[in-house]
């Protein structure tokens, strides 16, 4: 996605995901193109997953999970339906290359690999300024 125009941000994100502050790990949603969705997070000093001025691994994992949830939430709200609760079945082959510092903006692409009934298998790429930090 070349166009990084935010379509939902701030309080509007709370309509897409079940989490509530202080655990909200998505602050912007850029939309969906086919089997890809795009979201973001600006790392702030008050983030509960920040230590030593960096977002820790658990925060990146939670950001990916909430990015996937935001995709589902967007699809359901667009159809006028209630957003379902979801959960992570497993995390496989996660690679974290760098921990983003306070003030950095994460841009995350969620790709749907497979959907069977209500189970969705995804892959994710998390970037900061086009540098891959996790997948």
Language-model features, listed with the residues they occupy:
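Short aromatic-glycine motifs in intrinsically disordered, low-complexity regions
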Residues: 10-20, 82
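Catalytic strand-loop segment that frames the active site of acyl-thioester-processing enzymes
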Residues: 20-56
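HotDog/MaoC-like acyl-thioester-processing domains
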Residues: 2-3, 70, 77, 101-104, ...
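Hydrophobic beta-strand-centered segment that forms part of the acyl-chain substrate-binding groove
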Residues: 4-6, 70-107
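Conserved beta-strand residues within beta-sheet cores
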Residues: 23-26, 88-93, 107-109, 119, ...
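Conserved positions in beta-strands of structured domains
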Residues: 14, 27-30, 92, 97, ...
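Compact, glycine-rich, soluble single-domain proteins
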Residues: 52-71, 88
């Amino acid at each position: 996605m070349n166009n990084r125009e935010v379509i939902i941000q701030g309080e509007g994100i709370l309509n897409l995901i079940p989490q509530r502050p202080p655990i909200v790990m998505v602050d912007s949603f850029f939309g969906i193109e086919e089997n890809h969705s795009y979201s973001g997070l600006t790392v702030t000093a008050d983030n509960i997953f920040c230590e030593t001025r960096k977002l820790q691994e658990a925060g990146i994992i939670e950001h990916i999970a909430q990015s996937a949830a935001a995709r589902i939430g967007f699809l359901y709200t667009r159809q006028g339906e209630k957003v379902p609760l979801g959960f992570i079945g497993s995390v496989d082959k996660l690679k974290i290359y760098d921990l983003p510092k306070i003030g950095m903006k994460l841009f995350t692409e969620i790709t749907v690999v497979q959907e069977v009934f209500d189970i969705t298998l995804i892959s994710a790429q998390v970037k900061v300024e086009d540098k891959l930090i996790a997948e």
